[in-house]
């Protein structure tokens, strides 16, 4: 009986020790992070998911600028512009207004050169005409409408926007929605443009079409 009892004790102790070793090994493994081989020359903290600028759905290639533009919503929410991950115009920055909001960016460096808003309902259209006439070469032009961009729009202004690459400037009218990125002396029409006509049958808001959003990657210097 003593031998049998001793065997039971030994088996019991062996079982306890085995379980303890197993549990210790398991919990130790679960706390470890999977490490890459040293010969790769990198550690896990070096692996980071690249973040797109301006919240774009993709990362822009080298020598491209990231941008995102939203038109205003009716006459309630103002437009916003993001360029290279910087909000350059928005209601929060308190630098947008009714009509057309325009920002000029150096097409080579990406530096914001000038920005302003122009009241196209009761303001002086000559101010916008002067602004557009003085745009230097190799300049990117970002435009977002708010409330009413077209009442004071004249043929000279429409022609200047068309020369910047717009396909819809000549159609712009009362309370239309418009977002656009063009460039000085562009040889062809810009691919970065959206336009919605004010139409009571299709308007999303009472008296205004839906707001528009435009995002993408624009190449340096030449579009």
UniProtKB/Swiss-Prot annotation:
The keyword Glycoprotein applies. Glycans are attached at residue 106. Disulfide bonds join 54-82, 60-217. The keyword Signal applies. One of its GO terms (cellular component) is extracellular space. PROSITE patterns: GG_LECTIN (PS52031). It holds the Pfam family ILEI. GO terms for biological process: aorta development; negative regulation of insulin secretion; neutrophil homeostasis; neutrophil migration; positive regulation of macrophage antigen processing and presentation; signal transduction. Residues 1-25 form the signal peptide. It is found in: Secreted. One of its GO terms (molecular function) is carbohydrate binding. Coiled coil: none annotated. Residues 62-221 form the GG-type lectin domain. Belongs to the FAM3 family. This is Protein FAM3D. It comes from Mus musculus (Mouse).
């Amino acid at each position: 009986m003593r031998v049998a009892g001793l065997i039971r004790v030994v088996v019991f102790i062996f079982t306890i020790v085995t379980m303890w070793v197993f549990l210790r090994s398991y919990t130790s493994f679960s706390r470890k992070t999977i490490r890459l081989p040293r010969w790769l020359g990198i550690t896990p903290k070096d692996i980071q998911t690249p973040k797109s600028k301006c919240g774009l759905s993709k990362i822009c290639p080298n020598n491209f600028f990231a941008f995102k533009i939203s038109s205003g919503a009716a006459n309630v929410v103002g437009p916003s512009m993001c360029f290279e991950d910087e909000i350059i115009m928005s209601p929060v920055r308190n630098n947008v207004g009714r009509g057309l909001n325009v920002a000029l960016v150096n097409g080579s460096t990406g530096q914001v050169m000038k920005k302003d808003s122009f009241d196209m309902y009761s303001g002086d259209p000559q101010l916008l005409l002067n602004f557009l006439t003085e745009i230097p070469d190799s300049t990117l032009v970002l435009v977002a409408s708010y409330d009413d961009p077209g009442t004071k729009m004249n043929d000279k202004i429409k022609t200047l926007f068309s020369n910047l690459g717009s396909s819809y400037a000549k159609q712009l009218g009362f309370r239309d929605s418009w977002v656009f990125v063009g460039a000085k002396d562009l040889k062809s029409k810009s691919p970065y443009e959206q336009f919605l006509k004010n139409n009571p049958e299709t308007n999303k808001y009472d008296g205004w079409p839906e707001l528009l959003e435009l995002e993408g990657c624009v190449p340096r210097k030449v579009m």
